[in-house]
A protein has these predicted regions:
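A short, structural micro-pattern
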Residues: 9, 45-47, 78-82, 246
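Structural alpha-beta junctions
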Residues: 34-43, 109-120, 209-219
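Internal, hydrophobic cores of structured domains that mediate oligomerization or house catalytic pockets
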Residues: 54-178
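Short, surface-exposed beta-strand/loop "edge" segments at domain boundaries and coil↔beta transitions
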Residues: 21-27, 93-98, 127-128, 260-263
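N-terminal low-complexity, intrinsically disordered segments
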Residues: 19-77
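N-terminal alpha-helical "arm" segments
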Residues: 1-31
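Aromatic/basic-lined ligand-recognition segments
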Residues: 126-290
Length: 301
């Protein structure tokens, strides 16, 4: 069965900086905090709908940061308790994707750095890690754009299924939180057994990368009944050009689970269960690669 997705003419992306003091002249902080040519690109958009800056005391802020999470719990706590919220928002035509959200996020990071604040991705509800200065050509989805993280191991110890049982449980449900700003539906995969959580995560990552180019083309797009995911798709997710596996493409089936949300399933012809497919049919690298150091030129292959 085919799936049709509708890419909007415009999308909105937003970030916030949680800070402990009034930031003063935001535009000046941005100009000083970004390297060229990124700084020049940002300066050309400041004050337009493509890059708007606002500042609010936390008590009257339009953004609720009280449930922000992140890999660094100290940063997450600081974000939840900060007295000031600086918003970086953008309304973007499809032609400005994915560079527009990239510029907005770089702006938020520059403001956070100047104020010793904490940048927050409003789509994912997570803090943004400190990384090297962003470059115009430095966009890749692996750089914290999907908001998808693995759950606590074995459901925080509550899962009692045998680890060697391929289909022993269905504890894991994963979903993206961030594709909407690229004009795309969010993706989810559910009923995954604990031992296959990383493979399921990498299937979501690769599917997201496969769909990403559609976000630049407004209108209806009818996808085939089964989408073919290639080694090049997984490589591009990491910002890499080297092959990540040697075999052919992986077929996945997409389903319309809800408005703006697609489910990812095994191909219809696969005779077994989701977990058997995750275990038996995927390249080994999808079971192995969780992340890599962003300072490196390429992920391990």
């Amino acid at each position: 069965m085919h799936v049709t997705i509708t890419v909007p003419e415009e999308t909105t992306a937003g970030f916030a900086v949680a800070a402990d003091r009034d930031p003063g002249d935001l535009a000046a902080k941005v100009r000083r905090g970004l390297p060229r040519p990124l700084g020049a690109a940002v300066a050309g958009h400041l004050g337009t709908p493509q890059l708007m800056l606002t500042c609010h005391p936390a008590g009257s802020s339009p953004w609720n940061l009280s449930e922000v999470t992140g890999d660094d719990e100290d940063d997450a706590l600081r974000a939840r308790q900060a007295g000031w919220h600086i918003g970086v928002t953008c309304v973007l035509p499809a032609s400005d994707l994915p560079s527009g959200p990239h510029l907005a996020r770089a702006t938020a990071k520059a403001i956070a750095d100047s104020l010793r604040g904490v940048p927050v991705d409003l789509a994912t509800g997570r803090t943004l890690p400190a990384t090297r200065p962003d470059r115009l050509d430095d966009f890749f989805l692996a750089d914290d754009w999907l908001g998808t993280v693995l759950p606590p191991y074995r459901n925080s110890g509550r899962c009692t299924a045998d680890e060697d049982d391929i289909d022993g449980c269905a504890c894991v449900a994963l979903s993206t939180r961030g594709l909407g700003r690229f004009g795309l539906p969010e993706l989810e995969i559910t009923d995954v057994a604990c031992p296959h959580d990383l493979a399921a995560l990498n299937i979501l990552r690769t599917t997201a990368q496969r769909l990403l180019p559609l976000g630049r083309h407004p209108g209806d797009h009818t996808l085939p009944g089964e989408l073919l995911l290639t080694s090049a798709d997984f490589s591009a997710f990491w910002g890499n050009r080297d092959p990540m596996w040697d075999d052919g493409p992986i077929a996945v089936r997409l389903t319309e689970n809800a408005s703006g949300r697609l489910g990812v399933l095994p191909p219809a012809a696969f005779p077994g269960t989701l977990n058997e497919w995750l275990w038996d049919e995927l390249p080994p690298v999808l079971h192995e690669l969780l992340g890599w150091d962003l300072e490196r030129a390429a992920p391990p292959g």
